[in-house]
């Protein structure tokens, strides 16, 4: 497999990780390419595309370190092996432990366990599943890699069969977005919710998106006027700050639903 298609990830790795960590990530890419060469995604692209993008999200958008990046690259290798005979699985896990270390192996095995759990569409099940994920994740990095995994899936949801769209969107909305919220990963929470809403309620999503687009310049001007005196004071005090501006479409949708009259009246 031509690994130049993963130059974006490799560049991020070299910018962020130590030389030893970058070398381990390169070895992991080569190892994963060898073991997933015959596997493709629903659109015909190499299966490794998914793992490489999960690793990039973990590195650049979540801030994960070297071992986590290696585990993200290898997670599909271990998941596939776990569905084969025990001898094959044990041979491969021993190999990963020897080449990449015990911590990397532990994370990949935990991710495989989580992927094998089947969730039914109920809020009670979602709460139980959140607790189950935590129980499988003695290493907190496992949860973060899983969030990166789900974010990559949702960003590419159009390549999956249509019958999977609602299930994955429901899971993202009721499970993964809630985990991201509890971990303080609000950008990931909002993006998962927005994509899920686009697939679960496409008409409502488009209506809200159109209204936001119509009023964007007006909203930006208003926010700038409000923030100007605040940012001036912060600058004078030498304080660092971040100006959030993303509108959460799910919150707007929930507000709209709450404002709709109940059929039958009062």
Listing of model-derived features with the role each one plays in the protein:
Residues 1-266:
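Active-site helical microenvironments for divalent-metal-assisted chemistry
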């Amino acid at each position: 497999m031509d690994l130049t298609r993963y130059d974006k990830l490799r560049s991020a790795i070299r910018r962020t990780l130590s030389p030893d960590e970058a070398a381990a990530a390169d070895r992991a890419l080569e190892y994963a390419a060898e073991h997933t060469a015959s596997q493709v995604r629903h659109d015909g692209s190499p299966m490794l595309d998914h793992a490489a993008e999960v690793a990039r999200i973990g590195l650049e958008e979540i801030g994960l370190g070297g071992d986590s990046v290696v585990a993200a690259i290898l997670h599909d290798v271990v998941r596939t092996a776990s569905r084969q005979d025990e001898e094959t699985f044990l041979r491969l896990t021993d190999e990963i432990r020897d080449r990449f270390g015990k911590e990397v192996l532990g994370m990949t095995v935990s991710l495989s366990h989580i992927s094998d759990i089947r969730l039914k569409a109920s809020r009670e099940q979602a709460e139980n599943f959140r607790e189950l994920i935590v129980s499988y994740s003695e290493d907190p990095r496992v949860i973060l890699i899983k969030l990166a995994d789900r974010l990559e899936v949702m960003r590419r949801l159009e390549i999956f069969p249509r019958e999977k769209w609602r299930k994955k969107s429901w899971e993202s909305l009721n499970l993964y977005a809630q985990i991201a919220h509890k971990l303080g990963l609000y950008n990931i929470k909002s993006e998962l919710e927005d994509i899920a809403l686009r697939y679960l309620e496409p008409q409502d999503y488009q209506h809200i998106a159109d209204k936001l687009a119509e009023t964007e310049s007006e909203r930006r001007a208003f926010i700038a006027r409000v923030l100007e005196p605040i940012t001036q004071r912060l600058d004078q005090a030498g304080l660092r700050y971040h100006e959030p501006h993303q509108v959460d479409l799910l919150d707007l949708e929930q507000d709209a639903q709450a404002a709709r009259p109940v059929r039958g009246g009062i």
